[in-house]
């Protein structure tokens, strides 16, 4: 493992831990994990499948500064849709984060 891979691995574990503790929202966290998994050579790892699926299903929802580009009414609609999806998917996503922590931590 190279130094960069070790750093990325630590960042993955820290991100997953932040998602489990709810100090990082699941959408932002999943986007970060999907980007970092390539840096450790885990592009096709089954460990990340739930995260990849969640990220794919939520890529239309703006976070952070991107929200400023949308009308308030549309943001309310998107936020409602996202909340409903999170209610259904959160348990599986948190379980996936815990597996990542156990496997890579």
Task: State the predicted function of each range.
Residues 1-105:
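Acidic, Ser/Pro/Thr-rich low-complexity regulatory regions
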């Amino acid at each position: 493992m190279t130094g960069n891979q070790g750093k990325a691995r630590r960042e993955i574990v820290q991100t997953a831990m932040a998602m489990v503790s709810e100090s990082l929202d699941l959408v932002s966290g999943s986007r970060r994990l999907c980007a970092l998994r390539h840096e450790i050579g885990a592009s096709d790892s089954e460990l990340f499948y739930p995260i990849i699926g969640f990220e794919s299903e939520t890529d239309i929802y703006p976070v952070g500064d991107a929200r400023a580009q949308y009308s308030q009414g549309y943001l309310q609609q998107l936020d409602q849709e996202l909340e409903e999806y999170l209610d259904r998917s959160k348990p599986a996503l948190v379980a996936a984060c815990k597996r990542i922590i156990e496997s890579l931590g």
